[in-house]
Amino acid sequence: MSRKIDLLDRRRARVRRAIRAAANGRPRLSVFRSSKQIYVQVIDDANGRTLAAASSLDKDLRARLKTGADKAAAAEVGKLVAERAKAAGVTKVIFDRSGYLYHGRVKALADAAREGGLDF
């Protein structure tokens, strides 16, 4: 199990290094997924502040979702974070997949955030 975690940490560091080089002052849309939930934040790394956040544990989503661990839940979270980021005045972000493969829940969240008005 520790080999899997080591590989994830290496991928995560590689992705973050590439993001830092390409960011040009844009906030980072950071994704964390667990086996049961999905979380996303829009982070301003220059000031060290979280500008917007959403997760499958939010009260308004929790009543509508059957589970927080499927693509439908990820899409709802993506729409919600896009809505909150636009309310905070953010439209251009850089996508931080945190070492996860761009597939399944991560891809569904990214597509929904794009549809919601975020540009990345």
From Swiss-Prot:
Biological processes, Gene Ontology terms: translation
Matching InterPro entries: Ribosomal_uL18_bac-type (IPR004389), Ribosomal_uL18_bac/euk (IPR005484)
This protein's UniProt keywords: Ribonucleoprotein, Ribosomal protein, RNA-binding, rRNA-binding
GO function terms (MF aspect): 5S rRNA binding; structural constituent of ribosome
Domain of life according to the entry: Bacteria
Pfam families (UniProt xref): Ribosomal_L18p
GO cellular component: cytosolic large ribosomal subunit
Cited function: This is one of the proteins that bind and probably mediate the attachment of the 5S RNA into the large ribosomal subunit, where it forms part of the central protuberance.
NCBIfam families: L18_bact
Protein name: Large ribosomal subunit protein uL18
Origin species: Methylobacterium nodulans (strain LMG 21967 / CNCM I-2342 / ORS 2060)
Lineage of the organism: Bacteria, Pseudomonadati, Pseudomonadota, Alphaproteobacteria, Hyphomicrobiales
